[in-house]
Amino acid sequence: MALELIERGCPNCGGVISSDRLEKGLPCSKCLPKPTEEKVCDALEELKTLKYLKPFCDTDKSLERFINFFEKAVGAKPWSLQRVWAKRVFMNQSFAIVAPTGVGKTTFGLVMSLFLKGRVLAIFPTRLLAQQAGDRLSELAQKVGVNKKILIYQSKKNIREQFLNGDWDILLGTNMFLHKNFENLINFKFKLIFIDDIDSFLKRGKNVDYLFKLLGFSGEEIKLALKENKTQRDYDRLARIRKRKRDTVLIVSSATLKPRGKRAYLFRNLLGFDVQKAITTLRNIVDVAEPVKDLEEALEKSVELIKKLGKGGLVYLSVFYGKDKVQEVKEFYRKHGINAVSYLDYKPEELYQILEKGEFDVAVGISHITNPLVRGIDLPHIIRYAVFLDPPKHVFPTELTLSPPLLHGLLLTLLNLFEGDDRLKAIQYVMYLKRYLTLREEQLDNYPRIKERVEEIKNFLENYLKDENFLKKIKESEDISLVPKEGKLYIVVGDANSYIQASGRTSRFIAGGMTKGLSVVYYSDPKAFYSLKKRLALYYMTQEIEFKRLSEVDLNKLIKEIDEDRKRAREILQGKGVAQIKDLFKTTLVIVESPNKARTIAGFFGKPQMRLVEDSVAYEVPLGDRLLVITASLGHVLDLVTDKGFFGVLDDTYPYLPVYDTIKICRETHEQHTEYEYLKKRCKGKIEDKLEIIKGVREVSYEVDEVFIATDPDAEGEKIGYDLYLLSKPFNFNIKRAEFHEVTPKAFREAIQNPREVDLNLVKAQLVRRILDRWVGFTLSHILWDAFGKKWLSAGRVQTPVLGWVIKRYEESKEKKGEILLHVNDFPLKIEIEDLMFAKEIFKDLELADISLSNPQEEEKRPLPPYTTDTVLEDANEKLHLSAHKTMKILQELFEAGYITYHRTDSTRVSDAGKYLVAKPYITKMFGEEYFYPRSWGEGGAHECIRPTRPLEPKDLEFMITAGIAEFEDPENALKVYELIFKRFMASQMRPAKVITEEIILKLPYFEWKERVVTEVKEHGFDLMYPTFKVFPKKEKLEITHKEFREVPKVYPYTQGTLIQEMKRRGLGRPSTYAQIVQTLLERHYVVEEKGFLIPTDLGREVYEYLTKHFPEWTSEELTRKLEEAMDKIERGELDYMEVLKEVHRIKVLLKEEKAFKK
């Protein structure tokens, strides 16, 4: 049975289609009246109804032919990645190849050159490579029996004539050939242009211009793509240019680490892909750390280790030792029979050639990001291990210069040691210097205002570095060292980036996965090593690096594994062994809701390559056994229409059938609607249609082996996922749902390793929620429009009873009571008296009161449970004065960036990961293991409380924000909300506090008041993290040190936080809707906020009175609660969703009675 109809959802004709057809991967019944067992493409061709699916059907046929052709040429079928590339070529898409070493990039390009009809141009960096490719092409052509004219360009007269006459099918040349012969090349039309090495190609800007002219772009279009400070109109025009059908496909075979010059942007702006290489930060490395007495002992131990490990090692000294020490170390090794080379002995190109030949045991360098042995060495078959003679370090002189990068780095290093206003000043200085990191000291004279500010920053730091107390603070800190050298003082901290890059040379990405490596760090200064570990955890949260001792490692077994991987790498580089591993490498599309989440996930595994597909942005990054492609749907793609049936639901027959269409958004106002014409009347700017996002998702789904839909883990996320599942199913049958409750590498990996089917019960519950909101809301809203003559008024099944609570509470707040605030021995107490006159009398006689303490008892104080959506919204409102709407936006950002678990939850449950991987390490480190007291709090189930995803302190997140590692729209409040969550969670996993409580008794002849207070803490616990009580100061004499009388409401009006608590308590709304309900009441001007309290307006009262008087059944709290309970039952599969819709359908009668329903 179909759950919904989707207008413009048919993949073939763009017409209306039912969900049950899409689930089977079929087009609509108009295109294909009867479901068929044969291929859909063949059936549509037979019926002559093939339309929008034609490019995909044609590609399928071409791919089938190409697979046979490839197998004939190479002796094996193309593997997954090569099939993806082939599909892109046949779909006329240009792209840069993202792939590990040894997956047959050049082989693919050559076979595709032979397969395609039309001319092919292949550009290589050198004539030798062009010649080798030409020879290989001839060999492949012979195997498949293809008679194509292959011309390797040389300046010989006969070859030049052959070129000019067009007597060739495939032309191979160098970068210089293109530069010199563009005027002749422009006369030819190419089907494919293949660039083998984009790095060398980009060195000549003119060549890039020539390339884009060969691809059919005009000079004006190239100029627009290179224009700085583009307007929105420019971007719209570029989008139209990108979508224009082109006859020539460009394949860039190897992407570049650092695109040179602005011409690299031509690829993104005109072709929709980056030429920046996707860098994987995945590593398969055993990390070892060994304490030593000094550098001499490190050297002696390393000799022993190197002799055991053998050839293919890299040895690093930190920058603290300098170049002279590098040569000393090299000579030391040579004396001990180790064939050591130094990076100083050769130019970088020569050094690489020596390493590539394997003519060395170890190469010695400096563990700094600019050292040639730290970056750019990609020799998976040669490099086996790395030895660090001391931890990589950042070294800052205490004698400062005006260098912006130096001052920036030093400020960041010392940030946590500054206090109060100076800490804020230091953060501002870091933010300022961030803009000028490329500015050299000698350039500052050209910018007097900048120089003046940099001098101010230098003076700020110098004053601190002259302060003995501050220097003492540095010495006592756990991760910053003050080191003397040659009569000068240096500030030293660990260099995480250099460690990741240098050790990463031992584990490279090849076909079939990461090669195994070993990294050994010797350290004589425990502080320096701790500093490195801390920064690795901070900067590389996804790496989860854990150092072992050498004694814990089975070295013989590890050496064997390392050597097996090197053998595999050699075979792959020689073209052997690929057939065995090719099927292990898959292509996977992951669809999430937001671009932020897409970027976060892609960033877990390296620096992704960006690609535009229609209006979708796709991030591509290699992940072990697969190429990961991540894209975002930007929330819901479909919504209920308004112009069909009963407000979007066909109700002439039973069961009812909701009708959905793509969401259209006004770019200027962000207003959304499913009807283009409706929005056009209200929108001055461009209207964007989610259909364009769907087209992009469909296209990428078609390319890959499998699709995982990873929308949010709740009913709303399930409905978004279901829509994406339906719309993608005709293009890929292998679609699964991946669910994770925190955006972390571990949770993500587990989700894609344990996918599930879409949960139709959750989908049905969300369908019901949307339809009920529409039926009740629209029906009552239409009636209000007629009654009040205001078309912006609205009513809702939750909104209306909640408005009633606000009105009732406000009326109750007009009644006053007495509140006596007094301090006894400076301890604040509050006495509340209902009778105002009596309260005043007590206040007057307070000086006569007898105050005593009695009845001591030992008690255990327990912490509060961790946050749920309602409690965090209440606290953020009360403590930080943030609106519920603002807090939800911040929570969404924190979740998507991977700092907290899913924030729409009513569960207090803490998982084992939360208890033992997040709480325990932090509590043990800060207070001692005896303070750790694991609690599960809530019952089992999928949902968890809101908690941090790792033991990252708020001050560390502040550091990350300042350093630009973490970015938020409102960083200040994001940090405050994170701090609330962090402290409350950590306290929830700490032991109870044991206290002595006593009754404080205040007595008058006519009145007695008692309250139990804590007078002593016998044993601290959670109170050290998140105190929920104050300790009363016991003295011999108890006296009133302050008193104050106030008339206060008997009950206060609701705040946003207390209203949400009331909604939770009374079972109205859900975690995903609490904030929106409050926001709607404010937006409709039914309530206003005054001093944090919600006050009903006259309009709010009138609307509520009208609705409750005329339609009590549909605005009652009881009905709303019953419907919420019914939806929970639908989620659990205990209730038929149609029964609920049938019950509520009665509301349609109201429209007929009021004659308000206008078709």
Curated annotation (Swiss-Prot):
A single Gene Ontology CC term: cytoplasm
Primary site of residence: cytoplasm
Subcellular location as annotated: Cytoplasm
One BP annotation, GO: DNA topological change
Keyword Nucleotide-binding tagged: yes
Annotated NCBIfam families: rgy (TIGR01054)
Role summary: Modifies the topological state of DNA by introducing positive supercoils in an ATP-dependent process, increasing the linking number in steps of +1. Binds to single-stranded DNA, transiently cleaves and then rejoins the ends, introducing a positive supercoil in the process. The scissile phosphodiester is attacked by the catalytic tyrosine of the enzyme, resulting in the formation of a DNA-(5'-phosphotyrosyl)-enzyme intermediate. Probably involved in rewinding DNA strands in regions of the chromosome that have opened up to allow replication, transcription, DNA repair and/or for DNA protection.
Protein name, per record: Reverse gyrase 2
Species the sequence originates in: Aquifex aeolicus (strain VF5)
Lineage of the organism: Bacteria, Pseudomonadati, Aquificota, Aquificia, Aquificales
